[in-house]
């Protein structure tokens, strides 16, 4: 078994008696730089290369011209280089996924805080929209429906109208706060109620006039008939 290290890329195999470096003479000056490293690797004495006693031959190391089971060629380094970009891609993908997950968590937290704020807002009765068909939709082109008042609201408004047909703004604000209505709603209600009251008064005033107009004609006819009977 040869004791020198063999290069797997070389096509020729050197025998024990051939020189390792044929282009250079085997003299002491050539191997001066190698002799002071006698404790490591191979040593050169008497124009021969043999293994150092510090290293014992093993199966996983290549000695001589034969190749062991764990041989490392030039392709190994290329394969390692090819693995690096894939590792970088996977690391970049993991970083992107973690960044997306963090953004999603932040958005969920913001949405939760906004929902909590919306739920904590106190809604007063005057803030609710009461004069629409379904109570939903605030578009300008949406036709407003008729306001529906409760029995309690109508009763209180009728009482107020019985004493005062015209309200001051201060009194209107007080009634609006008491009945959970707006000033505009109370103003419109009083306007409609005054119109209704005027119609009622006009009807009551016209009915007695028609009756009084008919009675004189009947009396005249009766007076004319009485003298004829006497004759």
From Swiss-Prot:
One of its GO terms (biological process) is regulation of transcription by RNA polymerase II. One of its GO terms (cellular component) is nucleus. Residues 202-217 have a biased composition (Polar residues). It is found in: Nucleus. Residues 200-231 are annotated as: Disordered. Pfam families: Homeodomain. Keywords: Developmental protein, DNA-binding, Homeobox, Nucleus, Transcription, Transcription regulation. SMART domains: HOX. GO terms for molecular function: DNA-binding transcription factor activity, RNA polymerase II-specific; RNA polymerase II cis-regulatory region sequence-specific DNA binding. Disulfide bonds: none annotated. Its main location: nucleus. Coiled coil: none annotated. The keyword Transcription regulation applies. Residues 142-201 bind DNA. A motif (Antp-type hexapeptide) lies at residues 123-128. Belongs to the Antp homeobox family. Sequence-specific transcription factor which is part of a developmental regulatory system that provides cells with specific positional identities on the anterior-posterior axis. This is Homeobox protein Hox-C6a. It comes from Danio rerio (Zebrafish). The lineage of its organism: Eukaryota, Metazoa, Chordata, Craniata, Vertebrata. The gene is hoxc6a.
